[in-house]
């Protein structure tokens, strides 16, 4: 068995619970690393039909002394639902998993969300470990303890805050990631660049202009920096009462677009990319953001190979109605993360219907601002 090669470690401390984010290579095939965080005799691995043939066998071979059960779910956001969740519960109950069991999430953000939610609720909470295999999950979804399933009315409507025992990011898993999935993860990196600004924003701009790939030497450090940014925010505001809400930049638009298309047109990161551009245009319409910065955001998304316009086939009135179901609404006010400049974002609940409608019209394909 290979030994893992450590690139970086980010320590997270939330509400007295501490855990590491380990960025490495060969982490999935080093039994010593995996078993460091599994003290129980029982383990349930939750994965999907895409990831299982690639990595499940490697992970299982490192757990020979455990009762190791497996749930293999269908792949895709449209399967992040009650039916999949109860498939996990059924396996835990049928295989007589006790309160000291551990759940391992092996996959992308969808698997992490569902396995985490199952862990937070099975027998009022059991241990779980994140092994994210997509770039989006590595830089965003696996960090911070948000878990959820979707409801037909909207995305992530049923969920909890529940922190893992560890997040092990094995960079080797990105080698088998389809290019479209890799690009989708870049959207969350651009989000962090807009939130942080300064040298980090400039670095992301530069690597995207050069062409960021799975083989780029800058990638491990960029992943670590994204994890550090999110960890720092989540440590200060675990339950999204203030600062953490900034991490929703672009997501009010993105979630509505995903729900509108029944999660079948875009990957989550692609919807976020469109949402980031919408947020930039909205900020410009409110007189907050200079047009050259909006153009920079557009260029970053184009360099990343991501969509940024709303297709003209989308009914904007229906899209606006879906936004009214957004779970980030407070006091009946729809809240948006606004951008004054990279590194200066804030929550705004005073966006008028006219301003929002004008923004949506101007980000439709073929329309000019």
Swiss-Prot record:
Molecular function per GO: 3-dehydroquinate synthase activity; metal ion binding; nucleotide binding
Annotated signal sequence range: none
Required cofactor names: Co(2+); Zn(2+); NAD(+)
Catalytic activity: 7-phospho-2-dehydro-3-deoxy-D-arabino-heptonate = 3-dehydroquinate + phosphate
Chief location category: cytoplasm
Family recorded in the similarity comment: Belongs to the sugar phosphate cyclases superfamily. Dehydroquinate synthase family.
InterPro entries for this protein: Dehydroquinate_synthase, DHQ_synth_AroB, DHQ_synth_fam, DHQS/DOIS_N, DHQS_C
HAMAP family on file: DHQ_synthase (MF_00110)
Ligand binding (Zn(2+)): 188, 251, 268
Enzyme Commission number, as recorded: 4.2.3.4
SUPFAM superfamilies, A to Z: Dehydroquinate synthase-like (SSF56796)
Protein residues bound to NAD(+): 75-80, 109-113, 133-134, 146, 155, 173-176
An example Gene Ontology CC term for this record: cytoplasm
Protein name stated in the entry: 3-dehydroquinate synthase
Record's cofactor remark: Binds 1 divalent metal cation per subunit. Can use either Co(2+) or Zn(2+).
Enzyme class, broadest EC rank: lyase
Alphabetic keyword roster: Amino-acid biosynthesis, Aromatic amino acid biosynthesis, Cobalt, Cytoplasm, Lyase, Metal-binding, NAD, Nucleotide-binding, Zinc
NCBIfam families registered for this protein in UniProt: aroB
Function: Catalyzes the conversion of 3-deoxy-D-arabino-heptulosonate 7-phosphate (DAHP) to dehydroquinate (DHQ).
Keyword Hydrolase: no
GO BP term, example: amino acid biosynthetic process
Pathway annotation from the record: Metabolic intermediate biosynthesis; chorismate biosynthesis; chorismate from D-erythrose 4-phosphate and phosphoenolpyruvate: step 2/7
Compartments in which it is found: Cytoplasm
The encoding gene: aroB
